[in-house]
Amino acid sequence: MQKLPEAKLETPFQTAALTVLALCTYSADRNIGTEMLNWLRGPRPLNGQDISFLNDRFRDGKTYLPFTYFAGSTPDNNYTPTKPYSITIESNHVSGEEQGYMKLFIPCGGANSPRLIKLRQRGSDGKWFLGEQYLLTGVRTPKSEDPWA
């Protein structure tokens, strides 16, 4: 991930997109995903509570959760994104209210409203790091897992 152009972390949008990528990786390999998330968090790595939260969200086969943020992902196609893969990241009137922080929003194919991710800028070099993410909250059940579909 660190070889991608977005890994310069020059904008909060780059860091937000890489966070979705890291969460996708975490769903497949927790060790590599943890390394990626720790790198994105900069001087504030994941603690035990953070890791417990992540493990809880991916419990019961919910590995599809981070894929709901890719274009084309819907419950009807079991959150299979269209190619080429793309993610939309939005800002709004509250995004830059707090100095050194940026609140961004990522539309989700399994929810009615975009989900929040909060980034923090490091003063010494201007790079943007992951502060908080609210991307792993409940979404509509994929069609293949919905007994009512």
Language-model segment annotations:
Residues 17-22, 86-88, 103-105, 114-118, ...:
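Ordered hydrophobic segments in well-structured contexts
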Residues 52-112:
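Surface-exposed, charged secondary-structure patches
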